[in-house]
């Protein structure tokens, strides 16, 4: 009886005649698809593509938080019920938040200065002819108030242009003091004449009354003379430059390369055989070389050694490739030594096997 009572308590009130649940249509009982009137507070659609960075949402849209069943008796957090305003704890305790207004920068506007305006002239005067606390060597070293107040109205590119020009003038003054002695000892005496004649294409700082430095003096470059006459011939090309040679005088010394005119000679100073050796050795100090037959007179021009006679740098012997039989059909292969002439048996019974059949996948499939 107790089990029936428990079953009745669970199921009969839901399914039986004691109690029936009323199902709600989709969208609620007040949905417009069933002909009901629209509610007094219609559902608002939020535009999620709009930015709300600079706008304080004081009276925001009331969200439609309709819960079904037992969930309609409570709400989570600060989400209000339907028809109520949102509760903002921060605005209730500290007031409305004030967001700083950040002005947008126009990145499409050009910052290249064209001409000298009044603001740029004031900045130039401040950077160059101002008091000592404003600028020193093209950098701000004084108080930030005096410099920033005058330079705030000038664009950043104009400011950098004036600073760079000031640094260049300071470097020119330093170079003038350090290089005064070098100007009197210049190797090219035509520098002053080129500047005075105007052939250099640069403005004359001396004629303009400005400072003169070594970096402001355009000098002509001396032309490199022609090569030595003996270098025109390939037989004498190694006389004036050892670095361009590639041969050696001895087999153990990488130094002292000799000239190209001695390659075909048979001097005793060379310990490497440069050509086919004779039958006997005239000089006992000379290292004996290997006799090369007439059929093997093919030399390596780099090492001077034969290709086939001495085995150094020789040709590899050709390996004979056995090309017998068809790897797909199996025709033409020779029988191996392990093959027996007996008739193979399967399961103890004598059966004739067709030896000419092709295995699955062919002989070259790797399974056989």
Swiss-Prot record:
Residues 81-93 have a biased composition (Basic and acidic residues). It comes from the Eukaryota. GO terms for cellular component: cytosol; microtubule; microtubule associated complex; nucleus; spindle. The keyword rRNA processing does not apply. The modification Phosphoserine is found at residues 30, 111, 146, 157. InterPro entries: JUPITER (IPR033335). The keyword Cytoplasm applies. Keywords: Cytoplasm, Cytoskeleton, Microtubule, Nucleus, Phosphoprotein. This is Microtubule-associated protein Jupiter. The gene is Jupiter.
């Amino acid at each position: 009886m107790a089990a029936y009572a428990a079953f009745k308590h669970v199921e009969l009130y839901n399914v039986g005649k004691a109690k029936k649940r009323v199902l709600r249509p989709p969208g609620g009982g007040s949905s417009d698809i069933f002909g009901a009137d629209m509610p007094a507070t219609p559902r608002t659609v939020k535009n999620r593509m709009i930015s709300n960075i600079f706008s304080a949402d004081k009276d925001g849209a009331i969200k439609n938080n309709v819960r079904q069943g037992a969930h309609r008796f409570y709400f989570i957090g600060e989400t209000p019920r339907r028809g109520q305003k949102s509760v903002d704890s921060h605005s209730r305790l500290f007031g409305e938040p004030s967001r700083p207004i950040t002005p947008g920068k126009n990145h499409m506007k050009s910052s290249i200065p064209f001409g000298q305006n009044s603001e740029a002239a004031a900045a130039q005067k401040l950077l160059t002819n101002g008091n000592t606390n404003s600028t020193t060597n093209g950098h701000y070293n004084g108080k930030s108030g005096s410099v920033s107040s005058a330079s705030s109205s000038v664009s950043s590119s104009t400011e950098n242009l004036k600073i760079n020009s000031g640094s260049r003038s300071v470097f020119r003054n330093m170079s003038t003091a350090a290089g005064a002695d070098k100007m009197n000892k210049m190797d090219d005496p035509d520098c002053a004449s080129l500047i005075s004649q105007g052939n250099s294409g640069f403005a004359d700082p001396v004629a303009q009354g400005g400072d003169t430095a070594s970096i402001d003096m355009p000098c002509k470059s001396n032309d490199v003379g022609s090569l030595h006459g003996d270098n025109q011939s390939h037989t004498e090309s190694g006389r004036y430059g050892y670095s361009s040679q590639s041969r050696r005088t001895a087999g153990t010394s990488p130094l002292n390369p000799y000239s190209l005119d001695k390659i075909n000679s048979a001097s005793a100073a060379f310990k490497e055989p440069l050509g086919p050796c004779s039958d006997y050795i005239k000089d006992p100090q000379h290292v004996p070389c290997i006799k090369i037959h007439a059929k093997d007179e093919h030399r390596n021009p780099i090492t001077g050694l034969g290709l086939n006679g001495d085995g150094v740098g020789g040709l590899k012997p050709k390996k004979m490739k056995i090309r017998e039989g068809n790897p797909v059909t199996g025709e033409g292969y020779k029988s191996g030594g392990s093959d027996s002439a007996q008739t193979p048996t399967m399961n103890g019974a004598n059966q004739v096997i067709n030896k000419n059949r092709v295995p699955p996948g062919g002989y070259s499939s790797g399974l056989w």
